[in-house]
């Protein structure tokens, strides 16, 4: 109870709890039910069913009018935050027993944490990974369902990492997770800010709210942690305005603690100068130059030898689904990229344009937008595809609960009149490919 600083406690607290649960359907006798207010439902509406199923305690913002004699009621100001702190305490604060580093930003999170996992594994550590694509304990895969898991699952996963000998863990920290307090109660050794661009306005409402959500991550760091920010993104300084942590910077175009310069960008990789040392990397594009700088800076701030870090980084390949190249027998090249924001799509297409040979091969872009997500970026992404491509095919991504035709109609609004004859709309993604 001290971990959540309750406003009011009613009933006996001298009992051993079963599990911490926020879904009333999963409550068993002896469990603690935390009533969280969500975007789709309010957990307070399910307090009665939770008590009927034998909950030993209810944690909530508004106390119910009545409760069984054997059910303890705990009132808090923020149930979501309390859930995170309770989960951390329940699993004996696993994040304090390893070096946990998180990355937040619009683009680059998955590439950064995945390559950090590979880097530290090659450095000889057992490492945990929490990402959009997958979760890993060492090399053992744990299925991933969200960019950042719920607070209970997250602490359970970190506890499992500790039990299996992990010394480090790297995780993606989404804006949704921060606003929903999924990381409350966690102790971070460090935090990375990659960049911030147009995304998730369907959830946050405004771009300012999106920025504030990301900033929460750095506001919560303690004085022993480090904050590593992309200095070329003007909002990097905003992220660390109120942080107690030690701030370091990386950049390609500004003075920074970890300064990089792209010397050559080819279909085979990047030649870079980082803090005075020239290195060849297998990754492609300026956007990956930023990712590499963030990874390098993080490793050095975690105490690793700079030269050894650069040597290993030069041996690592790109992450699956991030600028993946497939070359057919006839010489046609396909590039697969996760790009799902206007800025990410622009970065990928500009990189492809810069890599075109003297023959100026045609760029055919197949792009779609997800359903039940920020609709304002749909015409923008279509316009970017037209600007940097010779031909464009608008197609389905994951429509979720929307009609694909409605999504494609939104995208079509961004097609310039002089590009209309270069654009096809094919809803079936397989057919488009």
Residue positions per predicted region:
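Generic hydrophobic/aromatic pocket-lining and core-packing "Φ" positions
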Residues: 47, 117, 158, 214, ...
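Active-site beta-alpha connecting loops in nucleotide-dependent enzymes
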Residues: 38-41, 319, 351-418, 429
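N-terminal leader/targeting and accessory segments in enzymes
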Residues: 1-85, 89, 234, 256-264, ...
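Acidic, Mg2+-coordinating active-site environments of NTP-dependent enzymes
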Residues: 2, 64-70, 164, 179, ...
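Receiver (REC) domain switch/active-site residues of two-component response regulators
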Residues: 56, 189, 390
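Phosphate-binding loop of NTP-binding sites
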Residues: 82-231, 235-243, 275, 293, ...
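P-loop/Walker A phosphate-binding loop and immediately adjacent motor/lid segment at beta-alpha junctions
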Residues: 49, 53-54, 59, 72, ...
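Active-site regions of enzymes building and remodeling cell-envelope glycoconjugates
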Residues: 7, 69-77, 142-145, 244-251
């Amino acid at each position: 109870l001290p971990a959540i600083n309750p406003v009011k406690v009613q009933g006996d607290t001298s009992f051993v709890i079963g599990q911490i649960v926020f879904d009333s359907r999963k409550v068993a006798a002896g469990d603690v039910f935390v009533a969280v207010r969500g975007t789709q439902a309010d957990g307070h509406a399910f307090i009665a069913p939770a008590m009927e199923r034998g909950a030993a305690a209810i944690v909530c913002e508004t106390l119910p009018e009545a409760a069984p004699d054997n059910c303890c009621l705990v009132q808090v100001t923020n149930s979501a935050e309390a859930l995170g702190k309770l989960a951390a305490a329940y699993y004996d604060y696993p994040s304090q027993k390893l070096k946990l580093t998180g990355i937040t930003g619009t683009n680059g999170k998955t590439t950064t944490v995945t390559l950090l996992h590979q880097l530290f594994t090659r450095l000889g550590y057992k490492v945990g990974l929490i990402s959009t694509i997958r979760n890993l304990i060492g090399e053992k895969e744990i299925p991933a369902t969200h960019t950042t898991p719920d607070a209970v699952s997250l602490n359970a996963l970190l506890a499992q990492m500790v039990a299996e000998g992990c010394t480090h863990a790297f995780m993606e920290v989404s804006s949704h997770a921060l606003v929903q307090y999924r990381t409350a109660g966690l102790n971070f050794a460090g935090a990375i800010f990659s960049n911030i661009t147009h995304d998730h306005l369907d959830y946050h409402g405004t771009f300012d709210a999106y920025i504030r959500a990301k900033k929460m991550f750095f506001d919560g760091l303690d004085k022993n942690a480090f904050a590593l920010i992309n200095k070329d993104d003007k909002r990097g300084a905003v992220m660390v305005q109120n942080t107690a942590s030690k701030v370091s910077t990386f950049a390609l175009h500004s003075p920074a603690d970890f300064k990089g310069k792209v010397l050559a960008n080819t279909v085979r990789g990047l030649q870079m100068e980082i803090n005075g040392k020239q290195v060849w990397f297998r990754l492609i594009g300026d956007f990956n130059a930023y990712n590499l700088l963030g990874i390098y800076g993080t490793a050095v701030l975690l105490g690793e030898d700079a030269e050894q870090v650069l040597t290993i980084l030069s041996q690592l390949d790109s992450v699956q689904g991030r600028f993946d190249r497939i070359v057919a027998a006839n010489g046609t090249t396909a590039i697969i990229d996760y790009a799902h924001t206007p800025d990410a799509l622009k970065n990928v297409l500009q990189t492809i344009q810069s890599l075109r040979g003297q023959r100026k091969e045609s760029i055919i872009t197949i792009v779609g937008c997800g359903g039940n997500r920020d609709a304002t970026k749909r015409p923008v992404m279509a316009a970017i595809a037209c600007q940097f491509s010779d031909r464009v095919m608008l197609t389905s991504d994951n429509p979720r609960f929307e009609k694909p035709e409605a999504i494609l109609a939104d995208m079509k609004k961004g097609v310039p009149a002089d590009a209309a004859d270069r654009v096809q709309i094919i809803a079936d993604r397989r057919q488009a490919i």
